[in-house]
Amino acid sequence: MPSSPVRIGVVFGGASGEHAVSIRSAITVINALQEGQNRDHFEVVPLYIDQEGRWWPEHIANSVLEQKQPLAEDSLPHPLPPAGFRSLPIDNDRVDVWFPVLHGPNGEDGTVQGLFTLMGQPYVGSGVLGSAVGMDKLAMKAAFAAAGLPQVPYVGLNVADLNHPERQNKLVARIEAELGYPCFVKPANMGSSVGISKARHRDQLLAGLKEAARHDTRLVVEHGVSARELECAVLGRQQLKASVVGEISFEADWYDYETKYTDGCSQTLIPAPLPDQVSAQIQAIALQACTAVHAYGLARVDVFYDEKSGDIWLNEINTLPGFTSQSMYPMLWEASGVALPDLVAQLVHTARE
């Protein structure tokens, strides 16, 4: 007798600034899980988390997937339950493996991973530790530094430092002395370039700190380097493997949210035109970065490469990378010989190891 399909609980949406990206990623993942031979092996059970953190069952999730954007509140069943997670909207024995397609806080940061761990059910991606450290840029950078991995200079701070004029002035002076301009101001716990700004002088730095503080209480300011932006994808658990290296090129001043998710605003070069030795170095750094934060399953590692000096700087790791039409993670594996349906199947099988 043929075996029963593996039931995949695809969770998407989420109470984060990357809600819209998550919906787009989920559409890609679900289509891949239902393509070709996967249709016989997997049964998709979609669950939607709205922007207030409420979990909704399949019929609501399917409506969101069909219209490719969040439902208006008056389209949701009333009376609305309280915001936040209360319970699963389905029996958890309906799911064999969870596939979180969540970006940003409350999904990529170890919170949902902790829930699945408590439930005793397998899930795609890193565990609680790797997800949490990989989400918080300050914790991530500390782990990279402890592993001896190269990074651009940076300064970390708490929003409380900005609420006292004297402390803020000292902090700004330190940033200018240690990093100079240009520099990039980032919330520690956001992705997809949400809340990030480039500062070329003090007024822009102050404005950037204020904007980043809208998204997080922990911030990081990084020295801006003139370098190529390269990415490498990682797959596996017991034995991690790295994809070919890809490059993002764009006309904009930097790789912001609009450039990242608007068709035609950026171009990808896969594989990136690099000497073999440089590609091998970047692949090695990608694997070392995963080990440093205890990431596994899937990850995308971003680096800067200065052609003139030959320097490679580790930028960040993303433990739940996007799966949109502009997302590098699936494209990097496609160029490495792993088609999207095979990729999602491997991710599910890895989760069950």
Curated annotation (Swiss-Prot):
Catalytic activity: 2 D-alanine + ATP = D-alanyl-D-alanine + ADP + phosphate + H(+)
Binding residue positions for Mg(2+) 2: 316, 318
Main location: cytoplasm
The organism of origin for this protein: Synechococcus sp. (strain CC9311)
Localization per Swiss-Prot or TrEMBL: Cytoplasm
Domain spans labelled ATP-grasp: 141-349
Protein name stated in the entry: D-alanine--D-alanine ligase
Phylogenetic lineage: Bacteria, Bacillati, Cyanobacteriota, Cyanophyceae, Synechococcales
One annotated Gene Ontology cellular component of this protein: cytosol
